[in-house]
Swiss-Prot record:
GO terms for molecular function: ATP binding; D-alanine [D-alanyl carrier protein] ligase activity. SUPFAM superfamilies: Acetyl-CoA synthetase-like. It is an enzyme of class 6 (ligase). InterPro entries: AA_adenyl_dom, AMP-bd_C, AMP-bd_C_sf, AMP-dep_synth/lig_dom, ANL_N_sf, DltA, DltA-like. This is D-alanine--D-alanyl carrier protein ligase. It catalyses: holo-[D-alanyl-carrier protein] + D-alanine + ATP = D-alanyl-[D-alanyl-carrier protein] + AMP + diphosphate. GO terms for cellular component: cytoplasm. The gene is dltA. D-alanine binds at residues 189, 293, 473. Keywords: ATP-binding, Cytoplasm, Ligase, Nucleotide-binding.
């Protein structure tokens, strides 16, 4: 098991001028990344609480992450797209001493020191720092959706991250340094799939910002100017990019590796991609945030595409085993499993335990094993994935119920081809709805201050009451049937 910081540092010493990370016109070389992160680590060395790293796709967010690893305190990434109320929830849960803010907006939290890019650049701290991160230390905490209305902080230990990065590098069939594309914001653990395999193999990390997410033409300009080799994204992002007619092997021959995670990869998407890139290495992977990004993988070939629809997610990676309960729930066992949720013993005890000295996580996903391959069949609870983002419907409902216009509510996912395409909020209003559009606007306006955009229902339907089951519980299935009737 080779230390991540040592690998990055060794490459930086032999290739100091190679670009480590790039976003538009901003870039940092390996020398700059290691120097600036060491300067930050000196500022953090007496800090025993995680470093909040705040911003959006700034190369200096990598400085924050690497610096926090060197200092041994670990980091918590927060993207600027996260609503302020949710940011405050996370900060209150983490209780950090220091926030590294790479954005132009001050967070202004009393009793918390706020470092900026300028403060690191102006620092005269030494540019060398021996990493203090231990294998069993928490390297990062990523917050996911929580059913109580509060996000849950998933804690990943350093050894788990190292194993994951090594596994990802082993899947790469190219030799030498590569240009990697990262689509996911750093507060989404899919970004980990690009960051550390890229940097530990001497590659350049190219960051896709939120403007490109909905505008493939902007991404097209990026591909024209940068010979991307390895692509990491959700399947949904690839589906959108396939609308570009020139996304093919003849137009962009450098693209030779594709890694997908975060949601189910549709068969049609994989087939369309392989039709355009018949020589590429394409991996379909699966894993929850609680098990260090991905725990299974399969290389998709024309033979696999021909044999399976839906597609398998492959076999488990080293030091990780999978099994299912009698109810069909997938359980993950091994080194990849998280240490649990930050300061949330009740939630941790509900889904994590130990067996034979190894950590176990109950995923809530339905799965079967067939022909030696694992297949994911959806959720066993009310947690869903929309555009690659995992969320709990109960969290959205909790926030909806805070509205003065909402007496009761159920959020219903709308499916197409076994994939969630948007959400509908079934609402029992506190008063008669006289203007549908105005009521919808007011509720959405309230939600925007408390939830990310992707968690806000596309539309609302108004109901006099919500149906109950025979034992007095809310009948979600009936609500969904009523909406779709």
């Amino acid at each position: 098991m080779t230390d991540i910081i040592n690998l990055i540092n060794d490459f930086g010493q032999s290739n100091p001028e190679r670009v480590a990370v790039r976003h538009k016109d901003e870039e940092l070389t390996y020398q700059q990344l290691m120097d600036e992160s060491s300067k930050l680590a000196h500022l953090l060395q007496d800090n025993h609480k995680p470093l909040i790293v705040y911003g959006h796709m700034s190369p200096y967010m990598l400085v924050g992450m690497i610096g926090a690893i060197k200092a041994g305190c670990g980091y918590v990434p927060i993207d600027t797209s996260v609503p302020s109320e949710r940011v405050n929830m996370i900060i209150n849960k983490v209780q950090p001493d220091i926030i590294f803010n790479t954005s132009d907006t001050q967070l202004n939290h009393s009793n918390i020191q706020e470092l900026t890019i300028q403060s690191i650049q102006d620092s005269d701290n030494p540019t060398l720092f021996d990493s203090q991160m231990g294998l069993t230390d928490v390297v990062y905490t990523i917050f996911t959706s929580g059913s109580t209305g509060e996000p849950k902080g998933v804690q990943i230990e350093y050894a788990s991250l190292i194993e994951f990065a090594e596994w990802m590098v082993s899947l790469n069939e190219s030799e030498g340094s590569q240009e990697w594309l990262n689509q996911a914001p750093f507060s989404f653990d899919l970004s980990v799939m690009a960051i550390y395999p890229c940097l530990t193999s001497g590659g350049t990390l190219n960051l896709v910002d939120k403007e490109m997410i909905n505008k493939p033409k902007l991404l097209n300009e990026m591909l024209v100017n940068t010979p991307i080799n390895a692509w990491v994204s959700t399947p949904s992002f690839m589906e959108m990019c396939l609308l570009l007619p020139n996304l093919n092997e003849s137009s962009y021959p450098s693209l030779n590796h594709f890694f997908f995670c975060g949601e189910i990869l549709p068969h049609r998407t994989a087939k369309a991609l392989l039709d355009r890139y018949p020589s590429a290495v394409v991996y379909n992977t699966y894993g929850p945030t609680e098990a260090t990004v991905a725990v299974t993988g399969i290389k998709l070939t024309p033979e696999v595409i021909e044999a399976y629809n839906p597609l398998p997610v492959g076999v488990s990676r080293p030091n990780t085993s999978l099994f299912t309960t009698d109810e069909g729930e997938l359980v993950i066992k091994g080194n990849s499993v998280s240490l649990g949720y930050l300061d949330n013993k009740e939630k941790t005890d509900a889904v994590f335990n130990f067996e034979d000295g190894l950590r176990i996580y109950h995923t809530g996903d339905k799965a079967i094993e067939k022909d030696g391959q694992w297949f994911i069949q959806g959720r066993i609870d009310f947690q869903i994935k929309l555009n690659g983002y995992r969320m709990e419907l109960e969290e959205i409902e909790t926030q909806l119920r805070q509205s003065e216009f909402v007496r009761e509510t159920v959020v219903v996912p709308v499916y197409k081809n076994n994939k969630v395409i948007h959400l509908i909020g079934a609402v029992v209003p506190t008063e008669e709805v006289r203007d549908d559009l105005e009521m919808t606007r007011q509720i959405k306006s309230e939600l925007k201050s408390r939830l990310p955009e992707y968690m806000i229902p596309r539309k609302f339907v108004w109901m006099k009451q919500l149906p109950l089951t025979s034992n007095g519980k809310l009948d979600r299935k009936q609500v969904a049937e009523d909406i779709n009737a």
